């Protein structure tokens, strides 16, 4: 199993990053993709990935930080993308739930990053919240120019999942699916996702699975808990855990072009 969404740059991991990574590998995680959410965090994620085995990173500007996007941002992403650790452009996309950056700023930054990914022939690591239709509209002209794309931390409806899958996207599933309050719809649509389009992630330190027993002493999520998420996904999909592990690992290799 491979965690495609770990925010290892988070201050919540500042005091024990080495231990967090070690616990993940001890728990059977085979690799980690460290998320870059703005230019500073993307540089930090690349540096962290450089320091650990079986770690890679993304480089991009999250919709929350889109107001910071400039021509210099593109130059920084080009530079980071040339490094061996960076295997995807992102996290980029749209978030109309909070609008920490205006919709206009978000759309400009998203489109610019899609263009960079297409030019560099790199996959895209994407975010979408409360912006499904506009997200697909902006993505559409670039679909055939991208080698692949994943919508990480998918929490949408069955119809939204089908529309994303019909456009060739991979879907990243987190511990949100373990939440008996908010995750029931996601749980029910899991069988809709073809095995060769499913990716798994923790989005740690966020989204600690609510159904872990015993509950961890800390509310901080960790990549070491990925196995619990995968176990639950396999159960709700009616699949064998080992088969799901093997398939999602193969999906990671295919999408990101990495070996682990």
Curated annotation (Swiss-Prot):
Any one GO molecular-function label of the UniProt entry: 3'-5'-RNA exonuclease activity
Q: What cofactor does this one take?
A: Mg(2+)
Q: What UniProt keywords are attached to this protein's entry?
A: Cytoplasm, Exonuclease, Hydrolase, Magnesium, Metal-binding, Nuclease
Q: List its EC numbers.
A: 3.1.11.-, 3.1.13.-
Catalytic EC class? hydrolase
**In which broad location class does this protein mainly occur, judging by the first location in its UniProt entry?**
cytoplasm
InterPro entries membership: DNase_TatD-rel_CS, Exonuc_TatD, Metal_Hydrolase, TatD-like, TatD/YcfH-like
Q: Which domain of life is it from?
A: Bacteria
Q: Which SUPFAM superfamilies match?
A: Metallo-dependent hydrolases
Is Cytoplasm among this UniProt entry's keywords?
A: yes
Output the CDD domains linked to this UniProt entry: TatD_DNAse
Location relative to the cell: Cytoplasm
**Positions annotated to bind a divalent metal cation:** 91, 127, 152
A GO cellular component term found in this entry reads: cytosol
Q: How does it assemble?
A: Monomer.
Which NCBIfam families did the record assign? PRK10425.1, YchF/TatD family DNA exonuclease
- Record family assignment: Belongs to the metallo-dependent hydrolases superfamily. TatD-type hydrolase family. TatD subfamily.
What does this chain do?
A: 3'-5' exonuclease that prefers single-stranded DNA and RNA. May play a role in the H(2)O(2)-induced DNA damage repair.
Q: What is this protein called?
A: 3'-5' ssDNA/RNA exonuclease TatD
Q: Which organism is it from?
A: Enterobacter sp. (strain 638)
Q: Organism classification, top ranks?
A: Bacteria, Pseudomonadati, Pseudomonadota, Gammaproteobacteria, Enterobacterales
């Amino acid at each position: 199993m491979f965690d495609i969404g770990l925010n290892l740059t988070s201050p919540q991991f500042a005091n024990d990053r080495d231990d967090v990574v070690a616990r993940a590998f001890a728990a059977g995680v085979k690799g980690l993709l460290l998320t870059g959410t703005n230019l500073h965090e993307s540089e930090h994620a690349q540096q962290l990935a450089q320091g650990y085995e079986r770690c890679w990173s993304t480089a991009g500007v999250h919709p929350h930080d889109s107001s910071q996007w400039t021509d210099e941002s593109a130059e920084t992403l080009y530079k980071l993308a040339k490094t061996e650790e960076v295997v995807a452009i992102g996290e980029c996309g749209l978030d109309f739930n909070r609008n920490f950056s205006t919709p206009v700023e978000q759309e400009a930054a998203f489109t610019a990053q899609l263009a960079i990914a297409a030019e560099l022939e790199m996959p895209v690591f994407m975010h979408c919240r409360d912006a499904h239709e506009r997200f697909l509209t902006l993505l559409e002209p670039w679909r055939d120019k991208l080698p692949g794309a994943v919508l990480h931390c998918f929490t949408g409806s069955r119809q939204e999942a089908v529309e994303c899958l019909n456009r060739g996207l991979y879907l990243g599933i987190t511990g949100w699916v373990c939440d008996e309050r908010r995750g029931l719809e996601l749980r029910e649509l899991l069988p809709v996702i073809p095995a060769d389009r499913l990716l798994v992630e923790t989005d740690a330190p966020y989204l600690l699975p609510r159904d872990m027993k015993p509950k961890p002493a800390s509310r901080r999520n960790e990549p070491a808990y990925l196995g619990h998420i995968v176990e639950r996904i396999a159960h709700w999909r009616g699949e064998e855990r080992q088969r799901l592990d093997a398939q999602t690992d193969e999906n990671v290799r295919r999408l990101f072009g990495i070996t682990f």
